[in-house]
Amino acid sequence: KEELTGLYKSRLIKIPFLRGMIILLDALLLGTRLLVLSANQQTGEEEKIEGPALYGTVGVSLVIGIGIFFVLPTLIAGGLEKIIETNSFVINFIEGIIRLIFLMVYVWAIGKMPEIHRFFAYHGAEHKTINAYEAQVELSPENISPFPLEHPRCGTGFLLIVVVISIVVFALLGPLDLIWRILSRILLIPVIVILAYEYMRWTANHLSNPIVRMLVFPNLWLQKMTPREPSPDMLEVSSMALK
Protein backbone atom coordinates (compact mmCIF):
# COMPACT_ATOMS: atom_id res chain seq x y z
CA LYS A 1 0.00 0.00 0.00
CA GLU A 2 1.37 3.40 -1.02
CA GLU A 3 0.36 6.97 -0.31
CA LEU A 4 -0.66 9.19 -3.20
CA THR A 5 2.14 11.35 -4.57
CA GLY A 6 2.29 15.00 -3.57
CA LEU A 7 0.98 16.08 -6.97
CA TYR A 8 -2.40 14.53 -6.18
CA LYS A 9 -2.64 16.73 -3.11
CA SER A 10 -1.53 19.94 -4.82
CA ARG A 11 -3.59 22.58 -6.59
CA LEU A 12 -2.10 21.51 -9.92
CA ILE A 13 -4.37 18.46 -10.01
CA LYS A 14 -7.39 20.78 -10.14
CA ILE A 15 -6.21 22.77 -13.16
CA PRO A 16 -8.01 21.65 -16.35
CA PHE A 17 -5.76 20.18 -19.06
CA LEU A 18 -2.67 20.18 -16.80
CA ARG A 19 -4.31 17.61 -14.50
CA GLY A 20 -4.78 15.24 -17.41
CA MET A 21 -1.06 15.01 -18.16
CA ILE A 22 -0.17 14.56 -14.47
CA ILE A 23 -2.71 11.78 -13.92
CA LEU A 24 -1.89 9.92 -17.13
CA LEU A 25 1.87 9.97 -16.58
CA ASP A 26 1.42 8.73 -13.03
CA ALA A 27 -1.01 6.04 -14.19
CA LEU A 28 1.48 4.91 -16.84
CA LEU A 29 4.29 4.52 -14.31
CA LEU A 30 2.04 2.87 -11.72
CA GLY A 31 0.57 0.49 -14.29
CA THR A 32 4.04 -0.55 -15.45
CA ARG A 33 5.17 -1.19 -11.88
CA LEU A 34 2.10 -3.31 -11.13
CA LEU A 35 2.53 -5.37 -14.30
CA VAL A 36 6.16 -6.02 -13.35
CA LEU A 37 5.12 -6.97 -9.80
CA SER A 38 2.48 -9.35 -11.15
CA ALA A 39 4.97 -10.95 -13.53
CA ASN A 40 7.53 -11.38 -10.73
CA GLN A 41 4.97 -13.05 -8.47
CA GLN A 42 3.96 -15.51 -11.19
CA THR A 43 7.58 -16.46 -11.91
CA GLY A 44 8.56 -16.49 -8.24
CA GLU A 45 11.12 -13.73 -8.71
CA GLU A 46 11.57 -11.22 -5.94
CA GLU A 47 13.83 -8.88 -7.89
CA LYS A 48 12.30 -5.43 -8.24
CA ILE A 49 12.36 -3.36 -11.40
CA GLU A 50 12.54 0.27 -10.44
CA GLY A 51 14.50 3.44 -11.06
CA PRO A 52 16.29 3.54 -14.44
CA ALA A 53 15.04 0.07 -15.40
CA LEU A 54 11.42 1.07 -14.81
CA TYR A 55 11.71 4.37 -16.66
CA GLY A 56 13.61 2.62 -19.45
CA THR A 57 10.79 0.10 -19.84
CA VAL A 58 8.22 2.88 -19.99
CA GLY A 59 10.36 4.84 -22.46
CA VAL A 60 10.84 1.91 -24.84
CA SER A 61 7.12 1.10 -24.66
CA LEU A 62 6.24 4.70 -25.50
CA VAL A 63 8.62 4.78 -28.47
CA ILE A 64 7.18 1.54 -29.86
CA GLY A 65 3.61 2.72 -29.31
CA ILE A 66 4.24 6.09 -30.96
CA GLY A 67 5.97 4.38 -33.87
CA ILE A 68 3.15 1.91 -34.51
CA PHE A 69 0.11 4.07 -33.83
CA PHE A 70 1.28 7.51 -34.95
CA VAL A 71 4.31 7.40 -37.26
CA LEU A 72 3.48 4.25 -39.27
CA PRO A 73 -0.08 5.35 -40.23
CA THR A 74 1.41 8.70 -41.33
CA LEU A 75 3.95 6.93 -43.54
CA ILE A 76 1.25 4.70 -45.06
CA ALA A 77 -1.01 7.69 -45.72
CA GLY A 78 1.96 9.53 -47.23
CA GLY A 79 2.48 6.63 -49.62
CA LEU A 80 -1.20 6.62 -50.56
CA GLU A 81 -1.03 10.36 -51.20
CA LYS A 82 1.35 9.68 -54.09
CA ILE A 83 -1.16 7.25 -55.61
CA ILE A 84 -4.46 8.98 -54.84
CA GLU A 85 -4.91 12.53 -56.08
CA THR A 86 -6.96 14.19 -53.36
CA ASN A 87 -6.76 17.00 -50.80
CA SER A 88 -4.95 16.99 -47.47
CA PHE A 89 -8.16 16.71 -45.45
CA VAL A 90 -9.02 13.38 -47.08
CA ILE A 91 -5.46 12.06 -46.64
CA ASN A 92 -5.48 13.04 -42.96
CA PHE A 93 -8.86 11.35 -42.55
CA ILE A 94 -7.54 8.18 -44.23
CA GLU A 95 -4.54 8.31 -41.90
CA GLY A 96 -6.90 8.45 -38.93
CA ILE A 97 -8.88 5.47 -40.19
CA ILE A 98 -5.63 3.50 -40.59
CA ARG A 99 -4.72 4.43 -37.02
CA LEU A 100 -8.13 3.26 -35.80
CA ILE A 101 -7.75 -0.06 -37.66
CA PHE A 102 -4.31 -0.54 -36.08
CA LEU A 103 -5.82 0.02 -32.62
CA MET A 104 -8.64 -2.47 -33.14
CA VAL A 105 -6.32 -5.12 -34.60
CA TYR A 106 -3.91 -4.61 -31.69
CA VAL A 107 -6.64 -4.97 -29.07
CA TRP A 108 -8.04 -8.05 -30.83
CA ALA A 109 -4.61 -9.67 -31.22
CA ILE A 110 -3.44 -9.27 -27.64
CA GLY A 111 -6.80 -10.57 -26.46
CA LYS A 112 -5.92 -13.91 -28.08
CA MET A 113 -2.81 -14.36 -25.92
CA PRO A 114 -3.39 -16.73 -22.93
CA GLU A 115 -1.44 -14.51 -20.53
CA ILE A 116 -3.37 -11.42 -21.56
CA HIS A 117 -6.67 -13.31 -21.30
CA ARG A 118 -6.08 -13.68 -17.55
CA PHE A 119 -5.07 -10.03 -17.35
CA PHE A 120 -8.31 -9.03 -19.10
CA ALA A 121 -10.28 -11.14 -16.62
CA TYR A 122 -8.77 -9.12 -13.76
CA HIS A 123 -9.58 -6.02 -15.80
CA GLY A 124 -13.19 -7.19 -15.92
CA ALA A 125 -13.15 -7.69 -12.15
CA GLU A 126 -11.88 -4.14 -11.77
CA HIS A 127 -14.71 -2.75 -13.90
CA LYS A 128 -17.39 -4.74 -12.11
CA THR A 129 -16.06 -3.65 -8.73
CA ILE A 130 -15.94 0.03 -9.69
CA ASN A 131 -19.47 -0.19 -11.11
CA ALA A 132 -20.64 -1.77 -7.85
CA TYR A 133 -18.82 0.84 -5.78
CA GLU A 134 -20.38 3.69 -7.76
CA ALA A 135 -23.79 2.06 -7.29
CA GLN A 136 -23.08 2.15 -3.53
CA VAL A 137 -23.58 -1.55 -2.88
CA GLU A 138 -21.59 -3.64 -0.43
CA LEU A 139 -18.42 -4.90 -2.09
CA SER A 140 -18.59 -8.68 -2.03
CA PRO A 141 -18.08 -11.11 -4.94
CA GLU A 142 -21.78 -12.02 -4.86
CA ASN A 143 -22.90 -8.39 -5.09
CA ILE A 144 -20.28 -7.39 -7.65
CA SER A 145 -20.81 -10.27 -10.08
CA PRO A 146 -24.08 -9.02 -11.72
CA PHE A 147 -22.57 -5.66 -12.68
CA PRO A 148 -21.47 -5.04 -16.29
CA LEU A 149 -17.95 -5.60 -17.57
CA GLU A 150 -17.89 -2.26 -19.37
CA HIS A 151 -17.06 1.06 -17.73
CA PRO A 152 -17.20 4.54 -19.34
CA ARG A 153 -13.75 5.53 -18.01
CA CYS A 154 -11.94 2.44 -19.28
CA GLY A 155 -8.41 2.83 -20.62
CA THR A 156 -9.34 0.96 -23.79
CA GLY A 157 -12.04 3.51 -24.48
CA PHE A 158 -9.53 6.25 -23.74
CA LEU A 159 -7.32 4.96 -26.56
CA LEU A 160 -10.30 5.12 -28.90
CA ILE A 161 -10.95 8.73 -27.87
CA VAL A 162 -7.28 9.57 -28.51
CA VAL A 163 -7.53 8.15 -32.03
CA VAL A 164 -10.77 9.99 -32.83
CA ILE A 165 -9.48 13.33 -31.51
CA SER A 166 -6.24 12.85 -33.45
CA ILE A 167 -8.28 12.54 -36.65
CA VAL A 168 -9.87 15.93 -35.99
CA VAL A 169 -6.68 17.69 -34.84
CA PHE A 170 -4.48 16.40 -37.65
CA ALA A 171 -7.13 17.11 -40.28
CA LEU A 172 -7.12 20.77 -39.20
CA LEU A 173 -3.39 21.13 -39.84
CA GLY A 174 -3.83 21.20 -43.60
CA PRO A 175 -1.19 20.13 -46.14
CA LEU A 176 2.30 19.42 -44.76
CA ASP A 177 5.45 17.82 -46.11
CA LEU A 178 5.93 14.25 -44.89
CA ILE A 179 8.70 15.13 -42.41
CA TRP A 180 6.68 17.97 -40.89
CA ARG A 181 3.63 15.74 -40.83
CA ILE A 182 5.49 13.09 -38.82
CA LEU A 183 6.92 15.71 -36.44
CA SER A 184 3.48 17.25 -35.92
CA ARG A 185 2.04 13.84 -35.02
CA ILE A 186 4.70 13.30 -32.37
CA LEU A 187 4.70 16.83 -30.95
CA LEU A 188 0.92 17.04 -30.69
CA ILE A 189 0.53 13.75 -28.78
CA PRO A 190 0.48 15.51 -25.35
CA VAL A 191 -2.18 17.94 -26.60
CA ILE A 192 -4.34 15.12 -27.96
CA VAL A 193 -3.94 13.06 -24.78
CA ILE A 194 -4.93 16.02 -22.60
CA LEU A 195 -7.99 16.76 -24.76
CA ALA A 196 -8.96 13.07 -24.63
CA TYR A 197 -8.71 13.02 -20.83
CA GLU A 198 -10.84 16.14 -20.44
CA TYR A 199 -13.41 14.73 -22.87
CA MET A 200 -13.60 11.43 -20.97
CA ARG A 201 -13.87 13.28 -17.67
CA TRP A 202 -16.68 15.45 -19.03
CA THR A 203 -18.69 12.55 -20.45
CA ALA A 204 -18.28 10.58 -17.21
CA ASN A 205 -19.82 13.49 -15.30
CA HIS A 206 -22.80 13.81 -17.67
CA LEU A 207 -23.91 10.22 -18.26
CA SER A 208 -27.46 11.11 -17.32
CA ASN A 209 -27.69 13.03 -20.61
CA PRO A 210 -28.94 10.74 -23.43
CA ILE A 211 -26.73 12.50 -26.01
CA VAL A 212 -23.66 11.90 -23.86
CA ARG A 213 -24.62 8.24 -23.48
CA MET A 214 -24.68 8.00 -27.28
CA LEU A 215 -21.20 9.54 -27.43
CA VAL A 216 -19.93 7.01 -24.88
CA PHE A 217 -21.42 4.01 -26.72
CA PRO A 218 -18.39 3.41 -29.04
CA ASN A 219 -16.19 3.39 -25.94
CA LEU A 220 -18.34 0.69 -24.33
CA TRP A 221 -18.58 -1.26 -27.59
CA LEU A 222 -14.80 -1.48 -27.96
CA GLN A 223 -14.62 -2.93 -24.45
CA LYS A 224 -16.32 -6.07 -25.79
CA MET A 225 -12.79 -6.94 -26.92
CA THR A 226 -10.97 -6.38 -23.62
CA PRO A 227 -12.54 -7.12 -20.19
CA ARG A 228 -13.35 -10.80 -19.64
CA GLU A 229 -15.71 -12.42 -17.16
CA PRO A 230 -13.75 -12.79 -13.89
CA SER A 231 -13.75 -15.69 -11.47
CA PRO A 232 -15.04 -15.24 -7.88
CA ASP A 233 -11.49 -15.10 -6.50
CA MET A 234 -10.67 -12.29 -8.95
CA LEU A 235 -13.70 -10.37 -7.71
CA GLU A 236 -12.50 -10.95 -4.16
CA VAL A 237 -9.09 -9.49 -5.05
CA SER A 238 -10.58 -6.45 -6.79
CA SER A 239 -13.00 -5.72 -3.95
CA MET A 240 -10.23 -5.95 -1.35
CA ALA A 241 -8.02 -3.69 -3.48
CA LEU A 242 -10.71 -1.01 -3.67
CA LYS A 243 -11.44 -1.22 0.05
Label the model's feature ranges.
Residues 89-103, 182-199:
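Small-residue-enriched core segments of transmembrane alpha-helices in multipass membrane transport
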Residues 1-59, 88-92, 98, 102-145:
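Large intracellular
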Residues 56, 60-72, 98, 102, ...:
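Hydrophobic alpha-helical transmembrane segments of multipass membrane transporters and ion channels
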Residues 93-157, 203-207, 213-243:
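Polar-ligand-bearing catalytic/cofactor-coordination segments
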Residues 16-38, 202, 206-225:
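A transmembrane-helix-recognition feature enriched in membrane-embedded lipid enzymes
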Residues 33-41, 61-85, 162-184, 190-193, ...:
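Juxtamembrane "helix exit" motif at the C-terminal ends of alpha-helical transmembrane segments
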Residues 41-47, 77-94, 173-183, 202-213, ...:
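Membrane interface segments of multi-pass transport proteins and intramembrane proteases
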Residues 14, 18, 22-25, 158, ...:
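Amphipathic alpha-helical transducer elements in NTP-driven molecular machines
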